[in-house]
């Protein structure tokens, strides 16, 4: 075939409705809003081309490779019900296009260039199917849910956490004191805020030392294993690992990373270090809403969650369904299951476009955090189940009597909900009653119930 210069329609090469997807393909579901007058087939083909082998014009060097082997293919397009001029384009990518064990490379290919494309008004990556042939090239979470429970010796209930507030401005000593009080009161974990790194008012090394002191004081007093998510996020990967090494030397159980601002390369390095050195890894999703909040442009959080499970993390923030941050119940539970379970069936009502088989990749604990308090406990226990971390920042530290009583109130409320559920009671219907009963003998819980009885974040 002679080389023929010029510009030709993408759909001639990249729109292949009769393509049978392979088990090894990475599949993507894009929500496209084409510019007026651009047919959906051309738009879908353009997405497939620009995120794989294509460029805007025919090039001579195409003849030196096999496009059929390497090109992305738009294999199906369906209109979005109830939306004008919006379509779901399904694209299949051959596995050879991606470097093994690199979320960074996967995203650079699939979402790197195509979102600025002129033929599209908007584009959103709604879901990805990661084939086992690719997921097997990733270490994944350093430990996973079962190993974490075994390390902490905590079973049969959600774990309790608390973000230390005010997030910025405390000295290291006062910060450690707040950590101790929460852990002593009955929480399993306390947490550095995502923007606590190493600022002038509290350098990281001082914070690590005082938080370790708090842990080692609270553990013998409560007879429980405690942890504080020490945020190792830093300006360079080397500095981040240095902080993780110091945490390991202190003997603490868990460190933390902001995976989107820190970047997937840094996150994967840290996850490998954590597995090699027995540290749990808590992941915060700071910056996610910049990427995932728009309904028709960006990347849905379920894709960012899948990417995190591949890159590695033992906990990740995933919305609350009930607190101050946005999240719809079915959709949230869809990506919560994608984080925890081995095998998730396609279910469009939960936003899951593809059946996902993680094989043996460890699971991630979803963290519910943001504007939640004791009255939410029955709903949270019911929605998230045992394999979750419930994090009450203001809902602990805002207690009228202080941090430790705030922690007591949350632990009593949680234990009451778990017991009620195990006795077969209906948490959704009897939730308020289940919280009121222990108030009779727990003044801490009674005080918390009084303070937050009217608080709702309903918009």
UniProtKB/Swiss-Prot annotation:
The record marks 324 as: Transition state stabilizer. Binds 1 Mg(2+) ion per subunit. The modification N6,N6,N6-trimethyllysine is found at residue 4. Its cofactor is Mg(2+). GO terms for molecular function: magnesium ion binding; monooxygenase activity; ribulose-bisphosphate carboxylase activity. Signal peptide: none annotated. It catalyses: 2 (2R)-3-phosphoglycerate + 2 H(+) = D-ribulose 1,5-bisphosphate + CO2 + H2O; D-ribulose 1,5-bisphosphate + O2 = 2-phosphoglycolate + (2R)-3-phosphoglycerate + 2 H(+). Mg(2+) binds at residues 191, 193-194. InterPro entries: RuBisCO, RuBisCo_large_chain_AS, RuBisCO_lsu_C, RuBisCO_lsu_C_sf, RuBisCO_lsu_fd_N, RuBisCO_lsu_N_sf, RuBisCO_lsuI. GO terms for cellular component: chloroplast. HAMAP family: RuBisCO_L_type1. RuBisCO catalyzes two reactions: the carboxylation of D-ribulose 1,5-bisphosphate, the primary event in carbon dioxide fixation, as well as the oxidative fragmentation of the pentose substrate in the photorespiration process. Both reactions occur simultaneously and in competition at the same active site. Heterohexadecamer of 8 large chains and 8 small chains; disulfide-linked. The disulfide link is formed within the large subunit homodimers. This is Ribulose bisphosphate carboxylase large chain. The lineage of its organism: Eukaryota, Viridiplantae, Streptophyta, Embryophyta, Tracheophyta.
């Amino acid at each position: 075939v002679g080389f023929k210069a010029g510009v030709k329609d993408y759909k001639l090469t990249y729109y292949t409705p009769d393509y049978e997807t392979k088990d090894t393909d990475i599949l993507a579901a894009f929500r496209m809003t084409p510019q007026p007058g651009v047919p959906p087939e051309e738009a879908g083909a353009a997405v497939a081309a620009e995120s794989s082998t294509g460029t805007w014009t025919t090039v001579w060097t195409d003849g030196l490779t096999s496009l059929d082997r390497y090109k992305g293919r738009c294999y199906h397009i369906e209109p979005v019900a109830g939306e004008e001029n919006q379509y779901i384009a399904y694209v299949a990518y051959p596995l050879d296009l991606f470097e093994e064990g690199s979320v960074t490379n996967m995203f650079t290919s699939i979402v790197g260039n195509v979102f600025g494309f002129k033929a599209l008004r908007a584009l959103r990556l709604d879901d990805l199917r990661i084939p086992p042939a690719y997921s097997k090239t990733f270490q994944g979470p350093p430990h996973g849910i079962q190993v974490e429970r075994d390390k902490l010796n905590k079973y049969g209930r959600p774990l309790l956490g608390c973000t230390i507030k005010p997030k910025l401005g405390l000295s290291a000593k006062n910060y450690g004191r707040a950590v101790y009080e929460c852990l002593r009161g009955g929480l399993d974990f306390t947490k550095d805020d995502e923007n606590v790194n190493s600022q002038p008012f509290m350098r990281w090394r001082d914070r690590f030392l005082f938080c370790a002191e708090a842990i080692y004081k609270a553990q013998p007093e409560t007879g429980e294993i405690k942890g504080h998510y020490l945020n190792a996020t830093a300006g360079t990967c080397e500095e981040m690992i240095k902080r993780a090494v110091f945490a390991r030397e202190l003997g603490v159980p868990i460190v933390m990373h902001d995976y989107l601002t820190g970047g997937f390369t840094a996150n994967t390095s840290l996850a490998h270090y954590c597995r090699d050195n027995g540290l749990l890894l808590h992941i915060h999703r700071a910056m996610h809403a910049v990427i995932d909040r728009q309904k028709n442009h960006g990347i849905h959080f379920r894709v960012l969650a899948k990417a995190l499970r591949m890159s590695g993390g033992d906990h990740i923030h995933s919305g609350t369904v009930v607190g101050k941050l946005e999240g719809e119940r079915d959709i949230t539970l869809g990506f919560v299951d994608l984080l925890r379970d081995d095998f998730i069936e396609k279910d469009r009502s939960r936003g899951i476009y593809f059946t996902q088989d993680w094989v043996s990749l460890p699971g991630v604990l979803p963290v519910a955090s943001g504007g939640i308090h004791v009255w939410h406990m029955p709903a949270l226990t019911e929605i998230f189940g045992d394999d979750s971390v419930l994090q009450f920042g203001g809902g602990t530290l805002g207690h009228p009597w202080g941090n430790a009583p705030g922690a007591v109130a949350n632990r009593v409320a949680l234990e009451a909900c778990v017991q009620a559920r195990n006795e077969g009671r209906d948490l959704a219907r009897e939730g308020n009653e289940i919280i009121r009963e222990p108030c009779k003998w727990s003044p801490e819980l009674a005080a918390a119930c009084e303070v937050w009885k009217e608080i709702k974040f309903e918009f």
